[in-house]
């Protein structure tokens, strides 16, 4: 997510 995890790139 845009402000959920540092790996938001993998989420969306």
From Swiss-Prot:
User: What are the GO cellular component annotations?
Assistant: extracellular region
For this UniProt entry, what is the primary localization, expressed as one broad class? secreted
MF terms from GO for this chain are: toxin activity
Tissue specificity here reads:
Expressed by the venom duct.
Location in or out of the cell: Secreted
Chain positions with 4-carboxyglutamate modification: 4, 8
Query: Isoleucine amide: which positions carry it?
Result: 12
Gene Ontology BP term (one): venom-mediated paralysis in another organism
| Keywords, in A-Z order | Amidation, Gamma-carboxyglutamic acid, Neurotoxin, Secreted, Toxin
Similarity comment: family membership: Belongs to the FARP (FMRFamide related peptide) family.
What does the record give as the function of this protein? In contrast to other conorfamides, this peptide does not show activity on human and mouse sensory neuron-specific G-protein coupled receptors MRGPRX1. In vivo, it causes hyperactivity when injected intracranially into mice, and when injected into the foot of the fresh water snail P.paludosa. It also causes paralysis when injected into the foot of the limpet P.opea. Has no effect when injected below the rear part of the dorsal fin of the fish L.reticulatus.
Q: What else is known?
A: The mature peptide does not contain cysteine residue.
**Name of this chain's protein:** Conorfamide-Sr2
Q: Which organism is it from?
A: Conus spurius (Alphabet cone)
């Amino acid at each position: 997510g845009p402000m959920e995890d540092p790996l938001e790139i993998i989420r969306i």
